[in-house]
From Swiss-Prot:
One of its GO terms (cellular component) is chloroplast thylakoid. The active site is at C145 (cysteine persulfide intermediate). Coiled coil: none annotated. It comes from the Eukaryota. This is Rhodanese-like domain-containing protein 9, chloroplastic. Residues 1-47 form a transit peptide. Keywords: Chloroplast, Membrane, Plastid, Transit peptide, Transmembrane, Transmembrane helix. It comes from Arabidopsis thaliana (Mouse-ear cress). Residues 62-185 form the Rhodanese domain. The gene is STR9. It is a single-pass membrane protein. InterPro entries: Rhodanese-like_dom, Rhodanese-like_dom_sf, STR9. SMART domains: RHOD (SM00450). Disulfide bonds: none annotated. Pfam families: Rhodanese (PF00581).
Amino acid sequence: MAGIISPSPTALYFTSNVGGRRLKAVSWAGKSVSGNVIRRRSLRIAAELKFVNAEEAKQLIAEEGYSVVDVRDKTQFERAHIKSCSHIPLFIYNEDNDIGTIIKRTVHNNFSGLFFGLPFTKVNPEFLKSVRNEFSQDSKLLLVCQEGLRSAAAASRLEEAGYENIACVTSGLQSVKPGTFESVGSTELQNAGKAGLITIQGKISAVLGTVLVCAYLFIQFFPDQAEKLFPPTS
């Protein structure tokens, strides 16, 4: 009696570098038994994540037709983003009101939120759906975030969903020099992640440092006047 054996992977497995992109190839063998054994083989190639610097990213957009997808939260996106990009955040504001979330949000807002201006977020459950609604699986996507971590995580999810032409900017937008991309917003792309008390502290430190340097120079060059202004304590 004829029988069908479902496809299973063989021992053939290799990786290769092609055009700066790592490739995996897996050979699948399907066996159809009907008197004589007939073997069919097909090759499935999956492109892995490609990391590029800012200049290479600019070339991907201009020369290879990559679309920019900004996966940052709304706050950083509004401060500065690449012109004509799509905004599909990997994380969204967490406004849940269960007791556990309220406690976590309060702790976050009094530490990370206060000092670094980081919003309290959760994974966007509509991320994949939003990408699918805007881009087909054969689209070329350049994912960007502020540090490079969220874009890498987003790329991993998209690869699992069948997207193969994906690139990310190494170290994110914080590594982009002013003028590299045409941007929209109140600040430069590399500064969009800076917020909270740490930005004020930086300005205070600069002013305080200037005052101390001036005081030191005054004491060195005008010791008599300095002694009158700051008499030594007995």
